Amino acid sequence: MSADYPTFKEALEKFKNLESDTAGKDKFNWVFTLENIKSAADVNLASKGLVQLYALQEIDKKINNLTTQVSKLPTTSGSSSAGAIVPAGSNTQGQYKAPPKKGIKRKYPA
């Protein structure tokens, strides 16, 4: 019957391994443990830190999503498509002509 359940030492090792895996996957190097939480102020501080960590992770996900969207934008590879981004310093002459200044009449306040 005892073979169905792990011993205390086996369970302890498993949880230690899980904790080290979590620490290894922690991207922001913020691993929260409940060791030193004794007062209500500690609880508030830890919950504030967890909220900040959650917000940072959400921001990181959004940045990753934006990065994938930006990398999918079309590039100008010889074709002059309407939505393409023009690289800096490229020749854009002939695409837009400013109106002649002779025909513009400005009214200046007296």
Curated annotation (Swiss-Prot):
Region (Disordered), start-end ranges: 72-110
Coiled-coil blocks: none
Species of origin: Rice tungro bacilliform virus (isolate Philippines) (RTBV)
Ranges of biased composition (kind: Basic residues): 99-110
Name recorded for this polypeptide: Protein P2
InterPro entries from the UniProt entry: RTBV_P12 (IPR009417)
Biased composition (Polar residues): 72-82
Domain of life of the native organism: Viruses
